[in-house]
From Swiss-Prot:
GO cellular component, one term: extracellular region
InterPro entries hit by this protein: AB_hydrolase_fold, Fungal_lipase-type, Sec_MonoDiacylglyc_Lipase
Gene3D superfamilies: alpha/beta hydrolase
Keyword Disulfide bond listed: yes
This protein's name: Secreted mono- and diacylglycerol lipase LIP4
Species of the source: Malassezia restricta (Seborrheic dermatitis infection agent)
Length: 300
C-alpha cells in the first residue's frame, strides 16, 4: 500500500501546477433510478477489469463467462492490458490500474489538459481536452490493441467490442471506447469504467454522451476519492453514466442520470484512503485486497 499512499501525496502537487479554469459543465439534478443494465453484466465487467492486476496465469484462463486470449505488459513500462472473449460482452479489452511503477504513477500526475493526439483526433469534436497522462498511457498500447481486437472479431465472428478497466485503467477504457467507436465499423458495444478519475474537460464529457451515451457506464464505490479528481474547478468533467454503490461494497446501487449528478457520489465527502476504491463491485472483488488472482466473477 505504500505506493498508493505515495500517489495520494502527489495529488496536491498536481493541483498546484494546473491553471484553474472554472467548472466546465452542467450538474444534473435528475432523480436516481434503477439500473438500466443487468447487474450480472456489471459483475462480469468488474471481473475482467480486475484480471490485468494478475501477473501469473494468462492465456486460456477463465473469468466468469470470458476466456483470456491475449495480454501485454507487466505494469512497469506500460500498463498491462488483456483481451478476452466474453459470451455476454464480446471481444473485451481490459486495462490495468495504477501500479507501483514510477512510470505508471507519473501517468496519474501528468494532469495537464491537452488536445487529443493527432492519431485519435478524428474520434472527438472540436474543443475536447484530455488528461495528458491517461492519454499517453492509452497511446502506448493503442495500435497493438486495435490489431488484436480486429483479429479476434474475425476469429470468433463477433462484432461486439467492450472496454473495461479500474482506476487509471478505467480512464484508458473510456479513451479506448471513444477511439474504437470511430475506428470499428460497428463501433463499440459497451464500456465500463470502475473507479474512474475525471478524464477530460466539459467538451469531452459532452462528446462521450453524444457518441457512446447509453453504452458507457462509470461506477463509483461509496466515498471513493479517485472519481473526485481532478476537481471540476480545474476544468475537468465526468460524462453521464454514473452508477453509485452506496454504502460501499454492498448491493445498494442506483443509476444517476446526467453529468455530475447532484444526488450521486458528489453528494458525500470522499474518504482519503483506498478502502472504497478497492472493493466489492456487484458481488465481484476488484482491486488490491478484495480482488483475487486469477480473477473471479460473482464470488464476493
Amino acid at each position: 500500500m505504500r505506493f498508493l499512499a505515495f500517489l495520494l501525496c502527489l495529488v496536491p502537487l498536481a493541483l498546484c501546477i494546473i491553471e484553474p479554469r472554472g467548472i466546465d459543465g452542467p450538474t444534473s439534478h435528475e432523480a436516481p433510478t434503477d439500473l438500466p443494465i443487468d447487474w450480472h453484466i456489471l459483475s462480469q465487467a468488474a471481473g475482467m477489469a480486475h484480471e490485468p492486476y494478475c501477473l501469473f496465469g494468462d492465456i486460456g484462463d477463465r473469468v466468469g463467462d470470458a476466456e483470456v486470449l491475449w495480454s501485454k505488459g507487466h505494469g512497469v513500462v506500460i500498463q498491462r492490458v488483456k483481451i478476452f472473449h466474453s459470451k455476454s460482452l464480446g471481444v473485451t479489452v481490459s486495462f490495468e490500474g495504477t501500479t507501483a511503477s514510477l512510470l505508471s504513477i507519473l501517468h496519474d500526475v501528468n494532469a495537464a489538459l491537452i488536445d487529443p493526439p493527432k492519431e485519435v483526433a478524428p474520434a472527438y469534436c472540436e474543443g475536447v481536452k484530455l488528461f495528458a497522462g491517461f492519454s499517453n498511457a492509452y497511446m502506448e498500447l493503442r495500435d497493438e490493441v486495435y490489431e488484436q481486437i480486429v483479429k479476434f472479431q474475425k476469429q470468433f465472428n463477433d462484432k461486439r467490442v467492450t472496454t473495461t478497466g479500474h482506476s487509471l485503467g478505467a480512464a484508458m477504457a473510456v479513451l479506448a471506447a471513444m477511439d474504437l467507436n470511430k475506428r470499428l465499423d460497428d463501433g463499440i458495444y459497451r464500456s465500463f469504467a470502475f473507479g474512474m478519475p475525471r478524464t477530460g474537460n466539459g467538451a469531452f464529457a459532452n462528446d462521450v454522451d453524444k457518441k457512446i451515451g447509453g453504452r458507457f457506464f462509470y461506477i463509483v464505490n461509496g466515498r471513493d476519492w479517485v472519481p473526485r479528481v481532478l476537481p471540476r474547478e480545474l476544468g475537468f468533467q465526468h460524462p453521464s453514466g454514473q452508477i453509485w454503490i452506496n454504502p460501499p461494497s454492498t448491493t445498494h446501487w442506483k443509476y444517476y442520470p446526467g453529468q455530475e449528478n447532484h444526488y450521486g457520489a458528489n453528494s458525500e465527502d470522499p474518504i482519503l484512503t483506498f478502502d472504497d476504491h478497492h472493493g466489492i463491485y456487484f458481488h465481484t472483488g476488484l482491486g488490491h485486497g478484495p480482488g483475487k488472482c486469477p480473477a473471479s466473477v460473482g464470488t464476493a
